C-alpha cells in the first residue's frame, strides 16, 4: 500500500472501501470513536508528502548494505505465541513474528542471522483475548499495569498483565532460535511462573 501514496486517487478509493468496515471494528470492538472521511483525507494530505521520500525497494537497499559490509538490524514486536504458524491459534496475528521470517519480509531473503536477541519483559502482558496462564487480577494487577503503562496506544484499554512465564519464554527461545536473552526491567523480580 505504500506505493499507492504516489497514486492518491487509487489510495483514496481503497480507503473509502475499507473505512466503513474498519469503523465498525473501531467502534464495536474497541469502543473508540470512528474516523470521518475528512479526518482521513486531512491526514493523507499532510502525511503522504512527508512519507514519500522514504519509500524505496527495501530489498535492493538491504542487499546494497550487505554487499558493503554494513550491519543490518531487524526488530520485531509481538511474541512467539502470536506467530501465525507457531502461536496459539486462533489468537495469532496475521503474519509471522519469528526471527527467521524477518529477512524474508524485508526483501533480503538470503540474509544469514548470526545473532538473535530475545527480549523478555520482567512481567507478561497480553493484548486481547486468548489463554494467559499467569494472568493477575485485582489490586496487584492494577499496580503492575500502572507502573508499566500497560494500556492500548489507540484505545487506552488496560492490557492483561502477570508475572513472567518461563515456560512460554523457553518456547519462544526455542522457536526463535535466540542466541541470547535480555531481561528488561525489575517490576516483578519476586514473581516468576514455572508452569
Set out the residue ranges of the language-model regions.
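Non-transmembrane, aqueous-exposed alpha-helical and coiled segments at domain scale
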Residues: 1-195
Amino acid at each position: 500500500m505504500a506505493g499507492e501514496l504516489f497514486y492518491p486517487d487509487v489510495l483514496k478509493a481503497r480507503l473509502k472501501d475499507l473505512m466503513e468496515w474498519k469503523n465498525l471494528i473501531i467502534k464495536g470492538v474497541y469502543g473508540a470513536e470512528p474516523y470521518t472521511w475528512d479526518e482521513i483525507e486531512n491526514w493523507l494530505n499532510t502525511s503522504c508528502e512527508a512519507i514519500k521520500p522514504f519509500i524505496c525497494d527495501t530489498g535492493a537497499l538491504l542487499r546494497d548494505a550487505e554487499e558493503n559490509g554494513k550491519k543490518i538490524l531487524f526488530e520485531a514486536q509481538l511474541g512467539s505465541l502470536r506467530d501465525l504458524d507457531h502461536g496459539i491459534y486462533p489468537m495469532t496475528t496475521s503474519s509471522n513474528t519469528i526471527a527467521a521470517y524477518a529477512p524474508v519480509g524485508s526483501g533480503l531473503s538470503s540474509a544469514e542471522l548470526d545473532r538473535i536477541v530475545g527480549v523478555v519483559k520482567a512481567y507478561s502482558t497480553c493484548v486481547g483475548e486468548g489463554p494467559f496462564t499467569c494472568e493477575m487480577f485485582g489490586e496487584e494487577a492494577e499496580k503492575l499495569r500502572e507502573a508499566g503503562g500497560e494500556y492500548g496506544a489507540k484505545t487506552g484499554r488496560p492490557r492483561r498483565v502477570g508475572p513472567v512465564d518461563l515456560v512460554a519464554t523457553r518456547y519462544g527461545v526455542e522457536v526463535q532460535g535466540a542466541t541470547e536473552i535480555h531481561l528488561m526491567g525489575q517490576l516483578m523480580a519476586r514473581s516468576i511462573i514455572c508452569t
